[in-house]
Curated annotation (Swiss-Prot):
Homomultimer. Self-associates into large complexes forming long filamentous structures. Interacts (via N-terminus) with the primer terminal protein. Interacts with host FtsZ protein. Its main location: host cell. It comes from Bacillus phage phi29. This is DNA replication protein 1. Protein that assembles into highly ordered structures and provides a specific site for viral DNA replication. Probably anchors the viral DNA replisome to the host membrane. Changing residue 40 to A: Assembles as protofilament sheets like the wild type. Changing residue 78 to S: Unable to form multimers larger than tetramers. Changing residue 72 to R: Unable to form multimers larger than tetramers.
Length: 86
């Protein structure tokens, strides 16, 4: 008899498929099974982290130097003026 997939647990890691290469994991999402591409998830996490670092650096530059360009970039990219900026 085959294994019963427990939808409450996530499968950790990837498996190697001779035809398609590394495969993602299957994880339950709102009761449905969904393939998760681990490499894509890692890239998205890295981009989100870099975005947060850039945003914090611009806020700090705008605050410390009262830099109008940094304030403008923050307004264009993030939709608002930093705290304490004009």
């Amino acid at each position: 008899m085959g294994k019963i997939f427990d939808q409450e647990k996530r499968l950790e890691g990837t498996w190697k498929n001779s035809k398609w290469g590394n495969q993602g994991i299957i994880a339950p999402v709102d009761g449905d099974l969904k393939m998760i591409d681990l490499e894509l998830e890692k890239k998205m996490t890295k981009l989100e982290h870099e975005n947060k670092l850039m945003k914090n650096a611009l806020y700090e530059l705008s605050r410390m130097e009262n830099n109008d360009y940094a304030t403008w970039v923050i307004k264009v990219l993030f939709g608002g003026a930093p705290h304490g900026a004009k």
